Amino acid sequence: MYKRQRKDGAFIKLKNLEETEPYFYTLQTMVSRIVRHLPEIDNKYFDERKDKPAGEKTTGLIVVTADKGLAGAYNHNVLKMAEEQMQKAGQTGSYKLFVVGELGRQYFGHRGIKVAEQFHYTAQNPTLHRARIITETILEQFEEEQLDEVYIIYTNMVNSVTTEPQMLRLLPIVCLLYTSDAADD
């Protein structure tokens, strides 16, 4: 009986993850449409900070892991990609690590890797309020030039069996991503 409940719980978590995917892509499409119809944009969120030497830039890495449960490749591949990106960012400047999920916090903590900010139990029970807290933290540091670019590293659910780690640049916003023919309806 316990195994059945556990499998059902994992199935429900997987189903919930799959249900968020259309929202993510719809949001990207909406941003594309808005940016495409704007005149030349001069906004702090589009600032590439080209005047700042590469060695002085700080990269923010938001690493999304599970709080509990779904283990294995779901977390392992994201953590591996995060470590690769930390090494890469460390070679050309510095990085700040922001961790969503208890397993990521434990992973980096056991390795003595400094985490700038950790967001507990956000992966297990995401809410708009928790998303706003993360957003405000990141935007504040970007606006104050404590961060020069921000990436999110997460697990993409290809299907119910296959997952793959993904990395997406959040800041500065790359206007060309949203104005190219690829972004057309």
Specify the residue positions occupied by each region the protein language model found.
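N-terminal assembly/interaction segments in proteins that build large macromolecular machines
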Residues: K3-S180
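A short, hydrophobic C-terminal helix/tail in secreted or cell-surface proteins
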Residues: D181-D185
